[in-house]
Amino acid sequence: MKKIGIIGAGGIARAHATALSTIKNAELVGVYDINQQNAESFVKTFGGKSFENVDELIDASEGLIVASPNFCHKEHALQALGKHKHVLCEKPMAISLEEASIMKDTAERLSVRASMGFNYRYLSYVNILKSLIINNELGNILSIKVHFKKNSALRRKKFTWRDDANSKKTSGSLGDLGIHLIDMVWYLFESDFITESVRAKMNTNVKTKEDKQVLVDDYAEIYGQLKNKVFVNIITSKCSVPEDCGFSIEVVGHKKEFKYHTGNPHVYKLIDGLNVVDCPVPQSLLNDPPNEFYGWADSFRSELINWIASTQNDWVEIPSFSDGFRSQEVLEMFFEKDSNSQPMSVSAVN
């Protein structure tokens, strides 16, 4: 697969196009966006053709990157799959479990490579951690804390589709940022959450933009336990102060602890009692854009290389639409567990 088209011309599409430009034998055919002016601006920067019709872009491409708004993912992915094209769909997979199920079932019937945009699987420090877990260097794992804090809800004053109800909460901090963390926990441990153990909190702190009500969360906390007995804490935020922003992972094993924070991006810490060792993180190739964390741009490049390779070699593993469906299930369970909508009753103690 060489000829790749992109549906959508927003920020994530630009990250894909930047990464694609560094990959040998990969060609950006062009882009389709509902806003033709955005598409024209996109191709001036990245090359290719601005398509006025999504079907024409699909016909001209061997593989499609679906980087449109969440509520368009199902439509655009099915259009591409219907023409037997390879697909890489941005996260979250869809805006409902029903949509995700249709997408998964369609992909499974066809001889194409349908991948999810879970690019955090390709972060170097995540894969270092995975190797440490697999090789039992941390010992039996007790807990993982993974926090992703941004300030986009404070910076972005314009009301957009991310703030309204069309995406059914999937464009809030938990759906937008947390879906990566849900998949990452699965990628590291391959163990499901115990539903009864999960507690969730979702808040909307920036309540209006341009005098319109914001209908999604900008802060969420999740607590729960996996079936393999690992305790999990997930925090996502789009309303953090700059000094608190960043991406962090802490894993406690009975032998050692692993700690990483993008505030100190070039090292991760291995802690054994009082002994703390700073270990190097590989140097990144691409420059990360403002307000994104270390390794973010490289993760798109690795994701695309892997997806392209998978179209030529079946043994190459990719985050599949089945993985996307699983993460969508967990996300919807978290929504249902939100304490704002599901008050817990506390029995009196005599």
UniProtKB/Swiss-Prot annotation:
Biological processes per GO annotation: antibiotic biosynthetic process
Highest taxon of source: Bacteria
Family: Belongs to the Gfo/Idh/MocA family.
Pathway listed: Antibiotic biosynthesis; kanosamine biosynthesis
Keyword NAD listed: yes
EC number: 1.1.1.361
A GO cellular-component term linked to this record: cytosol
Protein name, entry field: Glucose-6-phosphate 3-dehydrogenase
Gene3D superfamilies, per the entry: Dihydrodipicolinate Reductase, domain 2 (3.30.360.10), NAD(P)-binding Rossmann-like Domain (3.40.50.720)
